[in-house]
């Protein structure tokens, strides 16, 4: 039996899961209050705090301190291929100085440091958000100094794609898929035979708008906003990443509230949900052109995939391209654990971060 601890640091929470082989024995989301995080100027400063939270929780839950592997959510260091990577010092250095700051950058350092508490324990990351396998034609943008760089939900998209393949008695590596993860960020990717050959930057301004992100904006208007004198660089980035989309239009990023207001007959809320469904559908349609329309399946996943009206609108618009399959929610903890298990059992090769 292989014992695995998965760690997923988020902006205001740390999720942990303990697995015995494929069986979860603990899954816990530890919320962090604003007061707890206030002393830290940057996510990376939270390392020791998060580490102690993880160890304390394991102790409180009476989890034996015996693990074969610790697997962390990968950070936003430099672009890499999909897969499972052994954590090394170069990886820690890259995420520490990464331009894009996110709590997920703590995942590899937490995995490595905690693994040292247990003799023989290994430290991994799997399918981080900066997985970059773009085809050459997908990388080219309108300026040489601004090539397209994907930041997407690689972990969940690839896990759901593998699940779909298993359910249909085939291999992920034999399929052409368009996948869309719909949450606070919305990522779309074209998966050709196990590689995401095109994907958007779902973090800071590419693709559909989301509950809280602007998505793609008119470049000229954005330039005027930046030089209006009203905003600093950080304020503009916060608008793009945290205060755009439905939050800007409707005053809330709570999709349960949005769905309730729409169901109560609020036409404004319905209009913006229709617009969101349309933008997601445009993204799916655009990616289908990579395959010249010959797509095996379209997969919708993420927390917003529970929103029935939105999903049905997307299906109505893109169903002519390929069958649409819906896997609501996300299980990144299971995906992390199973990726680590695949390496420990010899089913998948671990990669070296270089």
Residue ranges and their predicted role:
Residues 2-7, 67-71, 177-181:
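Short glycine-aspartate micro-motif
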Residues 4-45:
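Short glycine-rich, Thr/Ser-proximal phosphate-binding strand/loop in the N-terminal lobe
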Residues 54-69, 167-170, 284-296:
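Phosphate/pyrophosphate-binding loops at sites that engage ATP/ADP/AMP, CoA/4′-phosphopantetheine
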Residues 58-103, 122, 130-142:
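Short beta-strand-loop/turn "lid" adjacent to the catalytic site in phosphate-handling enzymes
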Residues 106-113, 125, 140-176, 184-185, ...:
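Glycine-rich phosphate-binding loop plus the immediately following alpha-helix
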Residues 238-293:
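Adenine-nucleotide phosphate-binding core of ATP-dependent small-molecule kinases
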Residues 295-314:
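Glycine-rich phosphate-binding loops at beta-strand->alpha-helix junctions
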Residues 305-306, 325-354:
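Glycine-rich phosphate-binding/hydrolytic loop that grips phosphoryl groups
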């Amino acid at each position: 039996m292989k014992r695995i601890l998965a760690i997923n640091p988020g902006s205001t929470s740390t999720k942990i899961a303990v697995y015995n082989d494929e069986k979860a024995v603990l899954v816990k989301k530890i919320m962090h209050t604003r007061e707890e995080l206030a002393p830290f100027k940057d996510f990376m400063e939270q390392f020791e705090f998060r580490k102690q939270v993880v160890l304390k929780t394991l102790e409180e839950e009476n989890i034996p301190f015996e693990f074969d592997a610790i697997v962390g959510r990968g950070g936003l260091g430099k672009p890499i291929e999909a897969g499972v990577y052994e954590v090394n010092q170069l990886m820690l250095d890259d995420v520490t100085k990464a331009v894009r700051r996110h709590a997920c950058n703590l995942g590899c350092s937490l995995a490595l440091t905690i693994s040292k508490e247990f003799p023989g324990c290994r430290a991994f990351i799997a399918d981080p958000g900066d997985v970059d396998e773009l085809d050459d034609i997908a990388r080219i943008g309108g300026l040489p100094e601004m090539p397209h760089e994907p930041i997407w939900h690689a972990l969940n998209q690839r896990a759901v794609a593998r699940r779909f393949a298993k359910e249909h008695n085939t291999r992920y590596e034999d399929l052409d898929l368009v996948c869309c993860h719909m949450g606070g960020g919305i990522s779309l990717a074209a998966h050709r035979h196990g590689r995401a050959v095109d994907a958007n930057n779902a973090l800071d301004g590419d693709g559909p708008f989301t509950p809280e992100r602007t998505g793609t904006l008119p470049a000229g208007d954005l330039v005027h906003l930046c030089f209006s004198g009203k905003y600093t660089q950080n304020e503009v980035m916060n608008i793009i990443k945290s205060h755009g989309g439905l939050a800007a239009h409707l005053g809330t990023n709570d999709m349960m509230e949005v769905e309730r207001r729409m169901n109560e007959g609020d036409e404004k809320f319905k209009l913006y949900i229709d617009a969101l469904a349309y933008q997601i559908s445009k993204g799916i349609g655009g990616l289908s052109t990579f395959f010249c329309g010959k797509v095996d399946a379209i997969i919708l996943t993420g927390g917003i995939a529970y929103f029935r009206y939105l999903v049905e609108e997307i299906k109505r618009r893109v169903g002519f391209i390929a069958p649409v399959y819906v896997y609501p929610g996300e299980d990144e903890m299971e995906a992390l654990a199973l990726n680590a298990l695949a390496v420990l059992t010899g089913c998948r090769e671990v990669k070296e971060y270089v």
